[in-house]
Swiss-Prot record:
UniProt record, GO biological process: defense response to bacterium
Family the entry assigns: Belongs to the frog skin active peptide (FSAP) family. Ranatuerin subfamily.
Coiled-coil residue windows: none
Organism: Aquarana catesbeiana (American bullfrog)
Name recorded for this polypeptide: Ranatuerin-4
Main location group: secreted
Record-annotated disulphide pairs: C18-C24
Subcellular location(s) per record: Secreted
C-alpha cells in the first residue's frame, strides 16, 4: 500500500510543480 502511494506521489508531484511554477 505504501509503495503504491510513494510511486503515485512520484508521478503526481512533478506535474503539479510543473503546472504551478511553469518549470518543467
Amino acid at each position: 500500500f505504501l509503495p503504491f502511494i510513494a510511486r503515485l506521489a512520484a508521478k503526481v508531484f512533478p506535474s503539479i510543480i510543473c503546472s504551478v511554477t511553469k518549470k518543467c
